[in-house]
Amino acid sequence: MKQCAWKMVLFLSAVTIAGLVAAVPGHSQDWASIKEASSNIQSVKAEFLQKRHLQILKDPLLSEGRFFYLASGSLRWEYLSPLRSVMLQKGDNIRLYHFSEGAWKEEMTQAVEARRMVLAEMSQWFRGRYEESKIFSHAYSPGPPGRILLTPKEGINRFILGIEIVLSDRPGVIDRVEITEPGDSATRIAFKNVEINVSFPSKLFDEP
């Protein structure tokens, strides 16, 4: 169960940052400019509200968090409430932690296959190479608002049916990411306080 949950965290973080990178161009946001602008991103930080709808639950599950990303290969994806957890990536090394009994505890879940796929995808997305994705096909709609549609290929569609990245009117920012999952489940992530190409301490990627 934990392994499935962490697989979802890995994919959510990768897709979310890919969306933020894609949103860099100005209001026209044509596909060529989206790809070209990806190379200009050095860092991203943002806060988010995640709302997950499950068929078995009447009310959605709400989570709040934040993330920090460096183009050099570092990522911190952190849930702040209702439960605290964090994924730290630095290069090829990924560590997963949850906060329990007043302390951070490292997860022993391997999720090797998911990690490998996500890292491979991220390396392509950050360069604007959406066409080279091995696990998603893509389509772009200029809108307004502009949208990037990602459709999973065979294998990944076991737990993700489709992803829609909705671009904001504000250049450099996306409005939300909507993820459709099997069993009439869905996840929606809305962003606020997005900052691009800002500085933050490298220790954010070393410890919870």
What is each model feature region?
Residues 1-5:
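N-terminal secretory signal peptides that target proteins for export/translocation
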Residues 9-20:
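Bacterial N-terminal signal peptides
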Residues 21-28:
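Boundary at the C-terminal end of the N-terminal hydrophobic targeting segment
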Residues 29-53, 58-60, 98-156:
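Flexible, processing/modification-adjacent segments and terminal tails
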Residues 42-50, 63-67, 73-77:
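One face of beta-strands
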Residues 49-51, 72-74, 80-82, 92-94, ...:
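Solvent-exposed coil/turn segments that connect beta secondary-structure elements
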Residues 66-118, 187:
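An acidic-aromatic
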Residues 130-208:
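Gly/Pro-enriched, hydrophobic low-complexity segments
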